[in-house]
C-alpha cells in the first residue's frame, strides 16, 4: 500500500530522477479510483469551473467552490498529496486575504498545500503563506487566471525576452519558498532550462517531457470533454460515447417497460 505522500517525497523524487504523476480531481469517487492506482499528487484545480460547472474559463470560481470540492476529495482519505488552487481574487488584492484564504483551504477544505498563479508579482504572497507553514505550489507560463492580459490561451515564453522573464518568475517562486512549480504552455527547451536551474520540482502541463513531473485534467484524459482538447492532452480513454450508450439504453428500457424487472424490486 502506498504511504502518505509529503513534500519530502517530491524533493527526493526530483533528486533521484523519478517522475511525479499528478492529476486533477474534484470529487470523492474519482479520487478513490486514482489514489488506488498510486497517483503521487492530486490537484483540486479551479479548472473545476470549466470541466464541471461549464464556465468558459476559471475566473468565476469562488473560494466556496474550492472548499466544497476539496472537502469532497479529502473524504476519500487519499494517500496522494492534495493541493488546492487559490481561485481568482482570493490572493491578488492583499496579503491578509491571501493568508486567510490559503488557511481556509487547509483548515476547512483539508488540503495539504495551495497553488498560486504568478511569478515575481506574487513572490511576497508566496512568502506570506509559507510563513504560516502552508506549503505552496507556484504556477508560471500560461496562467489561466491571466487569460485576458495574455490575449487568450497562448503559449508563453517563445521569444528571448519572454523566456528570460519566465526564468525570473521561476527563480522568484523558488526564492519565495514554494516547494514545486507548475510550468504551463511553454516551449520544451525553456521548461528543460528551468527544470535544470531550480532545486524544486517542476510539474509540466503542455511544457514537454523534461519537467520533473506532469499534470493533466482528469476529464481530458478520460475523453469526457469533447468541445475542446488542447494539443498537449493525451486521451487514455474515450468515456463519453460509453456514457452516452448507457444513458440511451436506460432510456430505451424505461420507455419500453423493460426496466425495472422483478429482481430490481422489494417483497
Swiss-Prot record:
Keywords: Cytoplasm, Magnesium, Metal-binding, Pantothenate biosynthesis, Transferase. Coiled coil: none annotated. Its EC number is 2.1.2.11. InterPro entries: Pantoate_hydroxy_MeTrfase, Pyrv/PenolPyrv_kinase-like_dom, Pyrv_kinase-like_dom_sf. Mg(2+) binds at residues 46, 85, 117. GO terms for molecular function: 3-methyl-2-oxobutanoate hydroxymethyltransferase activity; magnesium ion binding. Belongs to the PanB family. Pathway: Cofactor biosynthesis; (R)-pantothenate biosynthesis; (R)-pantoate from 3-methyl-2-oxobutanoate: step 1/2. Homodecamer; pentamer of dimers. The lineage of its organism: Bacteria, Pseudomonadati, Thermodesulfobacteriota, Desulfuromonadia, Geobacterales. It comes from Citrifermentans bemidjiense (strain ATCC BAA-1014 / DSM 16622 / JCM 12645 / Bem). GO terms for cellular component: cytoplasm. This is 3-methyl-2-oxobutanoate hydroxymethyltransferase.
Amino acid at each position: 500500500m502506498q504511504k502518505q505522500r509529503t513534500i519530502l517525497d517530491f524533493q527526493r523524487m526530483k533528486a533521484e530522477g523519478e517522475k511525479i504523476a499528478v492529476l486533477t480531481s474534484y470529487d470523492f469517487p474519482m479520487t478513490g479510483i486514482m489514489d488506488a492506482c498510486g497517483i503521487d499528487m492530486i490537484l483540486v484545480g479551479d479548472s473545476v469551473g470549466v470541466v464541471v460547472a461549464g464556465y468558459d474559463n476559471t475566473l468565476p470560481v469562488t473560494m466556496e467552490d474550492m472548499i466544497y470540492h476539496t472537502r469532497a476529495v479529502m473524504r476519500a482519505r487519499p494517500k496522494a498529496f492534495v493541493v488546492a488552487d487559490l481561485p481568482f481574487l482570493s490572493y491578488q488584492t492583499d496579503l491578509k486575504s491571501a493568508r486567510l484564504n490559503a488557511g481556509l483551504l487547509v483548515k476547512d477544505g483539508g488540503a495539504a498545500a495551495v497553488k498560486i498563479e504568478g511569478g515575481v508579482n506574487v513572490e511576497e504572497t508566496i512568502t506570506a503563506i509559507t510563513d504560516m507553514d502552508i506549503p505552496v505550489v507556484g504556477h508560471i507560463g500560461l496562467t489561466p487566471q491571466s487569460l485576458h492580459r495574455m490575449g487568450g490561451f497562448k503559449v508563453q515564453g517563445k521569444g528571448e525576452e519572454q523566456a528570460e522573464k519566465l526564468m525570473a518568475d521561476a527563480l522568484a517562486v523558488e526564492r519565495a519558498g514554494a516547494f514545486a512549480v507548475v510550468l504551463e504552455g511553454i516551449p520544451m527547451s525553456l521548461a528543460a532550462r528551468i527544470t535544470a536551474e531550480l532545486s524544486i520540482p517542476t510539474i509540466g502541463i503542455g511544457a514537454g517531457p523534461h519537467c520533473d513531473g506532469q499534470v493533466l485534467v482528469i476529464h481530458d484524459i478520460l475523453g469526457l470533454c469533447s468541445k475542446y482538447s488542447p494539443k498537449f492532452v493525451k486521451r487514455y480513454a474515450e468515456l463519453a460515447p460509453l456514457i452516452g450508450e448507457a444513458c440511451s439504453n436506460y432510456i430505451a428500457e424505461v420507455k419500453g417497460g423493460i426496466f425495472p424487472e422483478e429482481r430490481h424490486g422489494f417483497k
